[in-house]
């Protein structure tokens, strides 16, 4: 079993209990006009030091009040299931603009129903296929 704790601080996710992580603040995305209007962080957290296994994650701050907001952990898994599904197709702060494909980068827009309206959101992948 693997255990690590999360401690949320202003503007960043801090991982404890010997978990090593690397992260990057994402300020823009292809297909989204302008800077992102929310705090999006991506990175890897080490889950098996001996074998060098890491999990990729997206972290999005809540619109509802930072550290006092509820914390939601969304884990995807299984063959052909990307953590991007949760971020852009299900509960995340942006979604694809539905329009006929014209050969360019798909456009993105903010999701008015994002769960980040009420909670801090950590999305990660834990599945049976290689990522």
Question: Model features per residue range: what roles?
Answer:
Residues 1-71:
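Catalytic-loop region of hydrolases
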